[in-house]
Regions:
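Polar, glycine-rich mid-to-C-terminal structural blocks
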Residues: 404-414
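Substrate-binding/active-site clefts of carbohydrate-active enzymes
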Residues: 162-167, 171-183, 191-364, 373-374, ...
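The feature marks proteins involved in alpha-glucan
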Residues: 1-6, 33, 37-43, 52-54, ...
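Short proline/glycine-enriched turn/loop motifs at strand-loop junctions of beta-rich domains
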Residues: 14-20
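Beta-strand signatures of extracellular beta-sandwich domains
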Residues: 22-24
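Structural beta-strand segments of beta-rich domains
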Residues: 7-11
Length: 414
Protein backbone atom coordinates (compact mmCIF):
# COMPACT_ATOMS: atom_id res chain seq x y z
CA UNK A 1 0.00 0.00 0.00
CA UNK A 2 0.92 3.64 0.41
CA UNK A 3 2.54 5.08 3.54
CA UNK A 4 3.59 8.63 4.35
CA UNK A 5 6.67 10.17 5.91
CA UNK A 6 7.13 13.91 6.04
CA UNK A 7 4.15 14.34 3.74
CA UNK A 8 5.76 12.24 1.02
CA UNK A 9 4.22 8.93 -0.11
CA UNK A 10 6.07 5.64 -0.39
CA UNK A 11 4.63 2.62 -2.16
CA UNK A 12 4.91 -1.14 -1.76
CA UNK A 13 3.30 -4.13 -3.45
CA UNK A 14 3.73 -7.74 -2.37
CA UNK A 15 4.20 -9.67 -5.61
CA UNK A 16 6.81 -12.41 -4.99
CA UNK A 17 6.24 -14.21 -8.30
CA UNK A 18 6.41 -11.08 -10.46
CA UNK A 19 9.24 -10.64 -12.94
CA UNK A 20 8.97 -6.84 -12.91
CA UNK A 21 6.78 -4.24 -11.22
CA UNK A 22 6.37 -0.61 -12.26
CA UNK A 23 4.44 2.17 -10.56
CA UNK A 24 2.36 4.34 -12.90
CA UNK A 25 1.50 7.76 -11.47
CA UNK A 26 -0.45 10.85 -12.47
CA UNK A 27 0.10 14.02 -10.46
CA UNK A 28 -3.12 15.81 -9.46
CA UNK A 29 -1.82 18.96 -7.79
CA UNK A 30 -4.25 18.24 -4.93
CA UNK A 31 -2.83 16.62 -1.76
CA UNK A 32 -6.26 15.09 -1.13
CA UNK A 33 -6.49 13.69 -4.65
CA UNK A 34 -10.10 14.80 -4.98
CA UNK A 35 -10.04 15.22 -8.75
CA UNK A 36 -11.20 13.04 -11.66
CA UNK A 37 -8.83 10.86 -13.67
CA UNK A 38 -5.90 12.97 -14.88
CA UNK A 39 -5.54 12.63 -18.66
CA UNK A 40 -2.38 11.72 -20.48
CA UNK A 41 0.32 9.08 -20.08
CA UNK A 42 1.61 8.26 -16.60
CA UNK A 43 5.04 8.66 -15.14
CA UNK A 44 6.69 5.24 -14.94
CA UNK A 45 8.84 4.35 -11.92
CA UNK A 46 10.37 0.86 -11.69
CA UNK A 47 9.97 -0.70 -8.26
CA UNK A 48 12.81 -2.42 -6.41
CA UNK A 49 12.28 -6.00 -5.27
CA UNK A 50 13.04 -6.87 -1.65
CA UNK A 51 13.85 -10.34 -0.38
CA UNK A 52 10.43 -10.68 1.26
CA UNK A 53 8.64 -10.37 -2.08
CA UNK A 54 7.74 -6.70 -1.74
CA UNK A 55 8.34 -4.30 -4.61
CA UNK A 56 9.06 -0.88 -3.13
CA UNK A 57 9.32 2.75 -4.19
CA UNK A 58 10.48 4.97 -1.34
CA UNK A 59 9.50 8.57 -0.74
CA UNK A 60 12.76 10.18 -1.78
CA UNK A 61 12.70 12.14 -5.05
CA UNK A 62 14.53 10.88 -8.10
CA UNK A 63 17.89 12.45 -8.99
CA UNK A 64 17.41 15.76 -10.79
CA UNK A 65 16.84 15.52 -14.53
CA UNK A 66 19.61 16.84 -16.74
CA UNK A 67 17.57 19.72 -18.11
CA UNK A 68 14.94 20.23 -15.42
CA UNK A 69 12.33 20.71 -18.12
CA UNK A 70 9.88 18.58 -20.01
CA UNK A 71 10.74 17.35 -23.50
CA UNK A 72 8.44 19.99 -24.92
CA UNK A 73 10.28 22.72 -23.03
CA UNK A 74 8.99 25.09 -20.39
CA UNK A 75 8.39 24.32 -16.72
CA UNK A 76 9.47 21.01 -15.19
CA UNK A 77 6.92 18.23 -15.72
CA UNK A 78 5.93 16.49 -12.49
CA UNK A 79 5.40 13.27 -14.44
CA UNK A 80 9.07 13.24 -15.47
CA UNK A 81 12.04 11.85 -13.49
CA UNK A 82 13.52 14.47 -11.20
CA UNK A 83 10.23 15.45 -9.63
CA UNK A 84 9.00 13.73 -6.46
CA UNK A 85 5.84 11.69 -6.40
CA UNK A 86 3.47 13.73 -4.25
CA UNK A 87 0.49 13.21 -1.96
CA UNK A 88 -2.79 12.99 -3.83
CA UNK A 89 -1.33 11.41 -6.94
CA UNK A 90 -3.31 8.79 -8.82
CA UNK A 91 -1.54 5.51 -9.42
CA UNK A 92 -1.67 1.97 -10.78
CA UNK A 93 0.68 -0.98 -10.59
CA UNK A 94 2.01 -2.65 -13.73
CA UNK A 95 2.89 -6.26 -12.89
CA UNK A 96 4.65 -8.64 -15.27
CA UNK A 97 3.91 -12.12 -13.96
CA UNK A 98 3.37 -15.70 -15.06
CA UNK A 99 -0.33 -16.59 -14.97
CA UNK A 100 -1.04 -20.35 -14.71
CA UNK A 101 -4.58 -20.00 -16.10
CA UNK A 102 -3.26 -18.58 -19.39
CA UNK A 103 0.04 -20.51 -19.39
CA UNK A 104 1.98 -17.38 -20.24
CA UNK A 105 3.56 -14.26 -18.81
CA UNK A 106 1.05 -11.41 -18.66
CA UNK A 107 1.46 -7.70 -18.06
CA UNK A 108 -1.36 -6.70 -15.73
CA UNK A 109 -2.25 -3.13 -14.84
CA UNK A 110 -4.13 -3.07 -11.55
CA UNK A 111 -5.17 -0.89 -8.66
CA UNK A 112 -3.54 -1.30 -5.26
CA UNK A 113 -5.03 -4.13 -3.15
CA UNK A 114 -4.36 -1.85 -0.16
CA UNK A 115 -6.03 1.20 -1.73
CA UNK A 116 -7.03 3.85 0.80
CA UNK A 117 -8.79 5.97 -1.81
CA UNK A 118 -9.81 5.66 -5.46
CA UNK A 119 -11.00 7.64 -8.41
CA UNK A 120 -14.57 7.29 -9.62
CA UNK A 121 -15.44 3.73 -10.68
CA UNK A 122 -12.19 2.54 -9.09
CA UNK A 123 -10.15 3.16 -12.22
CA UNK A 124 -7.08 4.28 -10.24
CA UNK A 125 -5.85 4.24 -6.67
CA UNK A 126 -5.14 7.58 -4.98
CA UNK A 127 -2.27 8.22 -2.56
CA UNK A 128 -4.15 9.86 0.31
CA UNK A 129 -2.74 10.38 3.80
CA UNK A 130 -5.63 9.50 6.13
CA UNK A 131 -3.90 11.51 8.87
CA UNK A 132 -4.22 14.76 6.87
CA UNK A 133 -6.26 17.16 9.04
CA UNK A 134 -8.09 18.43 5.95
CA UNK A 135 -9.81 15.04 5.83
CA UNK A 136 -11.17 15.37 9.39
CA UNK A 137 -14.68 16.86 9.58
CA UNK A 138 -15.27 18.63 12.87
CA UNK A 139 -18.16 16.54 14.16
CA UNK A 140 -16.34 13.28 13.42
CA UNK A 141 -13.14 14.51 15.08
CA UNK A 142 -14.83 15.86 18.22
CA UNK A 143 -17.72 13.45 18.87
CA UNK A 144 -16.71 10.35 20.82
CA UNK A 145 -18.41 7.06 20.13
CA UNK A 146 -21.21 6.34 22.58
CA UNK A 147 -20.54 3.55 25.05
CA UNK A 148 -22.47 0.29 25.19
CA UNK A 149 -22.19 -1.03 28.71
CA UNK A 150 -21.97 -4.70 27.67
CA UNK A 151 -22.71 -6.86 24.66
CA UNK A 152 -25.93 -8.25 26.11
CA UNK A 153 -27.26 -4.68 26.16
CA UNK A 154 -26.56 -4.18 22.47
CA UNK A 155 -29.56 -3.49 20.21
CA UNK A 156 -28.59 -3.59 16.51
CA UNK A 157 -30.41 -2.04 13.54
CA UNK A 158 -29.30 -3.41 10.15
CA UNK A 159 -29.43 -0.71 7.51
CA UNK A 160 -28.61 -0.35 3.80
CA UNK A 161 -26.94 2.99 3.26
CA UNK A 162 -28.62 3.94 -0.02
CA UNK A 163 -32.05 2.61 0.93
CA UNK A 164 -31.99 4.73 4.09
CA UNK A 165 -32.53 7.96 2.15
CA UNK A 166 -32.91 7.20 -1.58
CA UNK A 167 -36.65 7.91 -1.53
CA UNK A 168 -36.76 10.29 1.44
CA UNK A 169 -38.23 13.56 0.17
CA UNK A 170 -37.16 15.34 3.37
CA UNK A 171 -33.53 14.92 2.24
CA UNK A 172 -32.18 17.30 -0.43
CA UNK A 173 -32.13 15.43 -3.78
CA UNK A 174 -28.35 15.69 -4.14
CA UNK A 175 -27.85 13.98 -0.76
CA UNK A 176 -30.30 11.10 -1.18
CA UNK A 177 -28.67 7.70 -1.07
CA UNK A 178 -25.37 9.10 0.21
CA UNK A 179 -23.20 9.18 3.32
CA UNK A 180 -24.17 12.79 3.90
CA UNK A 181 -27.88 11.97 4.19
CA UNK A 182 -27.10 11.01 7.79
CA UNK A 183 -26.03 14.60 8.49
CA UNK A 184 -29.46 16.07 7.60
CA UNK A 185 -30.75 16.57 11.12
CA UNK A 186 -34.35 17.34 10.19
CA UNK A 187 -34.92 14.50 7.75
CA UNK A 188 -37.51 11.83 8.40
CA UNK A 189 -34.86 9.11 8.48
CA UNK A 190 -32.55 10.86 10.92
CA UNK A 191 -35.48 11.78 13.19
CA UNK A 192 -36.51 8.12 13.17
CA UNK A 193 -32.99 6.99 14.12
CA UNK A 194 -32.92 9.56 16.92
CA UNK A 195 -36.23 8.24 18.26
CA UNK A 196 -34.94 4.67 18.12
CA UNK A 197 -31.79 5.73 19.97
CA UNK A 198 -33.94 7.35 22.65
CA UNK A 199 -35.88 4.08 22.92
CA UNK A 200 -32.71 2.09 23.56
CA UNK A 201 -31.27 1.14 20.18
CA UNK A 202 -27.52 1.72 20.29
CA UNK A 203 -25.88 0.21 17.19
CA UNK A 204 -26.24 0.71 13.43
CA UNK A 205 -25.06 -2.22 11.28
CA UNK A 206 -24.34 -0.85 7.81
CA UNK A 207 -24.50 -3.27 4.91
CA UNK A 208 -21.27 -3.18 2.86
CA UNK A 209 -19.78 0.28 2.43
CA UNK A 210 -16.31 -0.74 1.23
CA UNK A 211 -15.52 -0.28 -2.46
CA UNK A 212 -18.05 -2.38 -4.39
CA UNK A 213 -17.30 -3.78 -7.84
CA UNK A 214 -20.55 -3.35 -9.76
CA UNK A 215 -22.29 -0.07 -8.86
CA UNK A 216 -21.77 2.80 -11.35
CA UNK A 217 -20.31 5.61 -9.26
CA UNK A 218 -21.26 8.48 -11.57
CA UNK A 219 -24.86 9.35 -10.80
CA UNK A 220 -25.39 10.22 -14.45
CA UNK A 221 -24.41 6.68 -15.44
CA UNK A 222 -27.00 5.06 -13.18
CA UNK A 223 -30.29 3.91 -14.70
CA UNK A 224 -33.59 3.31 -12.94
CA UNK A 225 -36.22 0.79 -14.04
CA UNK A 226 -39.22 2.27 -15.82
CA UNK A 227 -42.27 0.26 -14.86
CA UNK A 228 -45.06 0.55 -17.49
CA UNK A 229 -47.92 2.56 -16.02
CA UNK A 230 -50.49 0.01 -17.09
CA UNK A 231 -48.61 -3.08 -15.96
CA UNK A 232 -50.85 -5.59 -14.23
CA UNK A 233 -49.65 -6.58 -10.74
CA UNK A 234 -49.26 -10.19 -11.89
CA UNK A 235 -47.49 -9.40 -15.17
CA UNK A 236 -43.83 -9.99 -15.97
CA UNK A 237 -43.36 -6.37 -17.07
CA UNK A 238 -41.95 -5.29 -13.72
CA UNK A 239 -39.30 -8.01 -13.72
CA UNK A 240 -38.38 -7.22 -17.31
CA UNK A 241 -37.95 -3.53 -16.52
CA UNK A 242 -35.69 -4.29 -13.56
CA UNK A 243 -33.65 -6.81 -15.55
CA UNK A 244 -33.13 -4.32 -18.38
CA UNK A 245 -31.16 -1.92 -16.17
CA UNK A 246 -29.68 -4.44 -13.72
CA UNK A 247 -26.11 -3.84 -14.90
CA UNK A 248 -26.40 -0.07 -14.60
CA UNK A 249 -28.71 0.65 -11.69
CA UNK A 250 -27.56 1.76 -8.23
CA UNK A 251 -29.36 -0.98 -6.32
CA UNK A 252 -26.91 -3.46 -4.82
CA UNK A 253 -26.53 -5.00 -1.39
CA UNK A 254 -22.77 -4.68 -1.86
CA UNK A 255 -21.53 -8.23 -1.39
CA UNK A 256 -19.13 -8.05 -4.35
CA UNK A 257 -15.97 -6.53 -2.85
CA UNK A 258 -13.35 -4.87 -5.01
CA UNK A 259 -11.23 -3.01 -2.41
CA UNK A 260 -11.77 -3.90 1.24
CA UNK A 261 -10.12 -0.84 2.75
CA UNK A 262 -11.64 2.11 0.87
CA UNK A 263 -15.15 3.62 1.01
CA UNK A 264 -17.62 2.95 -1.80
CA UNK A 265 -17.82 5.84 -4.29
CA UNK A 266 -21.47 5.54 -5.34
CA UNK A 267 -22.51 6.59 -1.83
CA UNK A 268 -20.58 9.86 -2.10
CA UNK A 269 -22.33 12.94 -3.42
CA UNK A 270 -21.87 13.81 -7.08
CA UNK A 271 -18.49 15.49 -7.60
CA UNK A 272 -17.07 14.00 -4.40
CA UNK A 273 -16.40 10.42 -5.48
CA UNK A 274 -12.69 10.91 -6.12
CA UNK A 275 -9.82 10.49 -3.69
CA UNK A 276 -10.10 11.99 -0.24
CA UNK A 277 -13.50 13.58 -0.87
CA UNK A 278 -15.33 10.31 -0.28
CA UNK A 279 -13.19 9.71 2.84
CA UNK A 280 -14.48 12.97 4.30
CA UNK A 281 -18.10 12.11 3.57
CA UNK A 282 -17.78 8.64 5.12
CA UNK A 283 -16.33 10.21 8.26
CA UNK A 284 -19.15 12.77 8.30
CA UNK A 285 -21.61 9.88 8.40
CA UNK A 286 -19.80 8.19 11.29
CA UNK A 287 -19.67 11.47 13.21
CA UNK A 288 -23.38 12.10 12.68
CA UNK A 289 -24.34 8.61 13.87
CA UNK A 290 -22.12 8.94 16.93
CA UNK A 291 -23.79 12.27 17.67
CA UNK A 292 -27.16 10.49 17.63
CA UNK A 293 -25.87 8.10 20.29
CA UNK A 294 -25.35 5.21 17.87
CA UNK A 295 -22.30 3.02 17.40
CA UNK A 296 -21.36 2.04 13.84
CA UNK A 297 -20.75 -1.56 12.77
CA UNK A 298 -19.52 -2.37 9.25
CA UNK A 299 -20.52 -5.47 7.32
CA UNK A 300 -17.24 -6.82 5.92
CA UNK A 301 -17.00 -9.46 3.20
CA UNK A 302 -13.55 -11.05 3.30
CA UNK A 303 -14.65 -14.56 2.32
CA UNK A 304 -14.75 -13.87 -1.43
CA UNK A 305 -13.92 -11.35 -4.12
CA UNK A 306 -16.05 -10.09 -6.98
CA UNK A 307 -13.87 -11.91 -9.53
CA UNK A 308 -10.64 -13.81 -9.99
CA UNK A 309 -8.14 -14.67 -12.71
CA UNK A 310 -7.68 -12.15 -15.50
CA UNK A 311 -11.16 -10.67 -15.12
CA UNK A 312 -11.11 -6.84 -15.21
CA UNK A 313 -12.71 -6.82 -11.74
CA UNK A 314 -10.00 -9.06 -10.33
CA UNK A 315 -7.28 -7.27 -8.37
CA UNK A 316 -5.58 -9.82 -6.11
CA UNK A 317 -5.25 -12.59 -8.68
CA UNK A 318 -3.63 -10.23 -11.18
CA UNK A 319 -0.93 -9.39 -8.63
CA UNK A 320 -0.11 -12.87 -7.27
CA UNK A 321 -1.94 -15.42 -9.44
CA UNK A 322 -3.27 -18.41 -7.52
CA UNK A 323 -2.34 -17.15 -4.05
CA UNK A 324 -5.26 -15.19 -2.63
CA UNK A 325 -7.99 -17.67 -3.58
CA UNK A 326 -8.82 -21.11 -2.23
CA UNK A 327 -8.20 -23.79 -4.87
CA UNK A 328 -9.56 -27.29 -5.27
CA UNK A 329 -7.52 -30.44 -5.98
CA UNK A 330 -7.10 -29.57 -9.66
CA UNK A 331 -6.29 -25.90 -9.12
CA UNK A 332 -9.68 -24.33 -9.79
CA UNK A 333 -10.92 -21.49 -7.58
CA UNK A 334 -13.58 -22.78 -5.20
CA UNK A 335 -16.91 -20.97 -4.97
CA UNK A 336 -18.84 -22.29 -1.98
CA UNK A 337 -19.54 -18.63 -1.15
CA UNK A 338 -21.23 -18.38 -4.58
CA UNK A 339 -18.23 -16.30 -5.65
CA UNK A 340 -14.44 -16.70 -5.74
CA UNK A 341 -13.48 -17.95 -2.26
CA UNK A 342 -10.51 -16.22 -0.66
CA UNK A 343 -7.78 -18.16 1.13
CA UNK A 344 -7.42 -16.20 4.36
CA UNK A 345 -5.46 -19.15 5.75
CA UNK A 346 -2.59 -17.83 3.61
CA UNK A 347 -0.44 -15.40 5.58
CA UNK A 348 -0.61 -12.38 3.30
CA UNK A 349 -4.31 -12.80 2.58
CA UNK A 350 -4.91 -12.87 6.32
CA UNK A 351 -2.72 -9.81 6.74
CA UNK A 352 -4.69 -7.88 4.13
CA UNK A 353 -7.87 -8.71 6.03
CA UNK A 354 -6.43 -7.81 9.44
CA UNK A 355 -4.82 -4.59 8.21
CA UNK A 356 -8.02 -3.32 6.61
CA UNK A 357 -10.05 -4.05 9.76
CA UNK A 358 -7.52 -2.07 11.79
CA UNK A 359 -7.67 0.76 9.24
CA UNK A 360 -11.44 1.12 9.54
CA UNK A 361 -11.18 1.37 13.32
CA UNK A 362 -8.12 3.59 13.56
CA UNK A 363 -8.86 5.96 10.69
CA UNK A 364 -12.67 5.96 10.51
CA UNK A 365 -13.48 5.25 14.19
CA UNK A 366 -16.07 2.59 13.51
CA UNK A 367 -17.11 0.54 16.50
CA UNK A 368 -17.45 -3.01 15.26
CA UNK A 369 -17.69 -5.50 12.43
CA UNK A 370 -20.08 -8.16 11.22
CA UNK A 371 -18.17 -10.75 9.17
CA UNK A 372 -20.02 -12.24 6.23
CA UNK A 373 -19.84 -16.08 6.14
CA UNK A 374 -17.39 -16.04 9.03
CA UNK A 375 -17.18 -19.84 8.97
CA UNK A 376 -15.18 -19.59 5.74
CA UNK A 377 -12.30 -18.10 7.75
CA UNK A 378 -10.09 -20.21 10.01
CA UNK A 379 -10.64 -19.58 13.71
CA UNK A 380 -7.01 -18.50 14.05
CA UNK A 381 -7.60 -15.71 11.53
CA UNK A 382 -10.48 -14.33 13.57
CA UNK A 383 -8.34 -14.58 16.71
CA UNK A 384 -5.62 -12.58 14.96
CA UNK A 385 -8.19 -9.93 14.01
CA UNK A 386 -9.20 -9.67 17.66
CA UNK A 387 -5.60 -9.49 18.83
CA UNK A 388 -4.69 -6.76 16.33
CA UNK A 389 -7.63 -4.64 17.42
CA UNK A 390 -6.80 -5.15 21.09
CA UNK A 391 -3.44 -3.49 20.48
CA UNK A 392 -5.06 -0.16 19.55
CA UNK A 393 -5.06 2.34 22.41
CA UNK A 394 -6.50 5.78 23.02
CA UNK A 395 -3.02 7.14 23.70
CA UNK A 396 -1.38 5.86 20.51
CA UNK A 397 -4.29 5.49 18.07
CA UNK A 398 -7.18 7.58 19.37
CA UNK A 399 -9.37 4.49 19.83
CA UNK A 400 -9.70 1.68 22.35
CA UNK A 401 -9.46 -1.42 20.21
CA UNK A 402 -10.57 -3.69 23.05
CA UNK A 403 -14.04 -2.14 22.89
CA UNK A 404 -14.56 -3.00 19.20
CA UNK A 405 -17.47 -5.42 18.83
CA UNK A 406 -17.03 -8.45 16.55
CA UNK A 407 -19.63 -10.93 15.38
CA UNK A 408 -20.21 -13.01 12.28
CA UNK A 409 -22.71 -14.77 10.10
CA UNK A 410 -23.17 -18.13 11.75
CA UNK A 411 -23.66 -20.51 8.84
CA UNK A 412 -21.67 -23.63 9.64
CA UNK A 413 -20.13 -24.45 6.28
CA UNK A 414 -17.09 -23.53 4.26
Amino acid sequence: GVTFSGGRPSFALWAPTAQAVTLLTWETGDPLGSVPDVPGPPRRTPAVRHDDGRWVIDSRPDPPAATGASEAGGAPDQNQPGSPITAGCQYLWEVRVYVPSTLQVETNIVTDPYSVALTTDSTRSVAVDLADPHLSPEQWAETPAPAVRNDSARSIYELHLRDFSAADETVPPELRGTYRAFTVAGSAGVRHLAELAQAGMNTIHLLPTFDIATIPEHRGSQRSPRIPAGAHPASADQQAAVAEVADDDAYNWGYDPLHWGAPEGSYATEGHQDGGARVVEFREMVGALHDLGLQVVLDQVYNHTAACGQDPRSVLDQVVPGYYHRLDAVGRVTSSTCCANTATEHALCERLMVDSVVRWVRWYRVDGFRFDLMGHHPRTVMEHVRAALDELTMEADGVDGRSVYLYGEGWNFG
